[in-house]
């Protein structure tokens, strides 16, 4: 392991408290002035090991006084903040898309905690002075540079001393709960998980987040891309702190700024904007940039007090693993709270009821958006989230970044297993593992493993023990090898295997059925049209074609009519097709879909299932 330089910063408190000041985060009515003084500290033993050429240290300590009491703030660089293939995209005045891969690994965004305080946390930017927030003795404090000429002065203040931008409570636009949440939480909490389910819940999960900034927000910050970047980095850094208790790690995989014009129609009606953004992600973003979830930050003022909206229980869905958030506050912590709330909906969590609580402070999933950066998930939210994970098991969250992809030096205690490490359970103060040595990031004596579906009581599970049950007709169960803590790669039924009571045939691990495809396009209550619609619509250019050649729609042969444009019905409306966007596959019957007894759609042709694969 590479020894890391520890840096101690001493804060000298200014002899008076300010009465009122305008800071970058807003008007502050009461604050303390402190002067950070950086004091290098040698590692234990007095020998300073060579360090890689970096601008910012991996680990730092800050010592200062809060209300006259000395505290030590430990900080560690959030090495999981950016994905290994992070990109930034903006647009030239002529509309050209410009995408770069900036070197962001030597960044200045940190997580931390107050020494000797169990329930403390921090999210700090050290890019230009110290900016962020930390929790001390149950209260949230903010720190921010005063930016006075020839001065290193900073302000420390509490949330209650920030002048509110308006008195109207901010709310989330989600009004309907998912059907799975109709069961009372009290009843859910009485259910007992199987050992396999408990192991799945304990596995670390990762969300690769793509953030889009619309044109109005871009102009609100004087068309300054650097200012936008820093703002988004701070938000995602805070988002990470809020999701750590759920065992989720959020990596920013891309940031896109619509610097020329908006790429979708953004309206004050939040549901319309959400739907448009979801379609854009599916048809435009995903083909060029993989991601697990996308959030749109907008400068528009949504109708009423609404500042965000998301689909519920849709993580990993191409069109619905999205959220839209109004950039409703100067303080990044407040917007980050809204981002956390809407992502919670994507993860299957509904609004908390009156019986839910978070011990102290506001709950993240309250229908009224919290202005506290360290609000927590209630026990109701945790149970609801776990129920969603066990029911749906979204696969995209299990894509763990490879240790070889992390290019910065390894740091023991940051929860990421990196080069030279066999486990990483966090700092010695935070480590909850009986199998991992938090100081060395090696297994404890005689331990074979720390975590994984095939790890039990620090030992590999026996060969043949099931580690991943079949989740549906097209999936196969996996068993441990006895030689590894990891469950073998997910495997599927052969293509052409009957599924869903012979309604379809398996194709690449899924059971494509027209009814489900109609629901994905048109929402609940939509069904596939009768067979005669597929014959009638062959004479309608927009709905009766199998492929497009040189801009011309080619009609389907009679035998292939069920493999072209998908036709759906809802209520009295029959034979509905969905207009083709610039994505030629949008609204088409998916490959592998059943088009007759013993027949499937392959390359827009209805062929015998025995010869198709």
Swiss-Prot record:
Peptidase M12B domain mapped to chain residues: 205-401
Subunit structure: Monomer.
Cofactor(s) it depends on: Zn(2+)
Binding sites annotated in the UniProt record for Ca(2+) 3: 475-476, 478, 490
Propeptide residue span(s): 21-191
Enzyme class: hydrolase
Protein name: Zinc metalloproteinase-disintegrin-like MTP4
Binding site for Ca(2+) 1: 208, 292, 396, 399
PANTHER family documented for this protein: ADAM A DISINTEGRIN AND METALLOPROTEASE DOMAIN (PTHR11905), DISINTEGRIN AND METALLOPROTEINASE DOMAIN-CONTAINING PROTEIN 28 (PTHR11905:SF32)
The keyword Transferase is assigned to this record: no
Source organism: Drysdalia coronoides (White-lipped snake)
Subcellular location: Secreted
Positions with a binding annotation for Ca(2+) 2: 414, 416, 418, 421, 424
Cysteine pairings via disulfide bonds: 316-396, 356-380, 358-363, 412-441, 423-436, 425-431, 435-458, 449-455, 454-480, 467-487, 474-506, 499-511, 518-568, 533-575, 543-577, 546-556, 563-601, 595-606
GO molecular function terms noted in the UniProt entry: metal ion binding; metalloendopeptidase activity; toxin activity
Position of the signal peptide: 1-20
Keyword tags: Calcium, Disulfide bond, Glycoprotein, Hemostasis impairing toxin, Hydrolase, Metal-binding, Metalloprotease, Protease, Secreted, Signal, Toxin, Zinc, Zymogen
Gene3D superfamilies per the UniProt record, alphabetical: Collagenase (Catalytic Domain), Disintegrin domain
Pfam families: ADAM_CR, Disintegrin, Pep_M12B_propep, Reprolysin
Cofactor mode of binding and number, as noted: Binds 1 zinc ion per subunit.
Region Hypervariable region that may play important roles toward cell migration, annotated ranges: 561-574
Native organism taxonomy: Eukaryota, Metazoa, Chordata, Craniata, Vertebrata
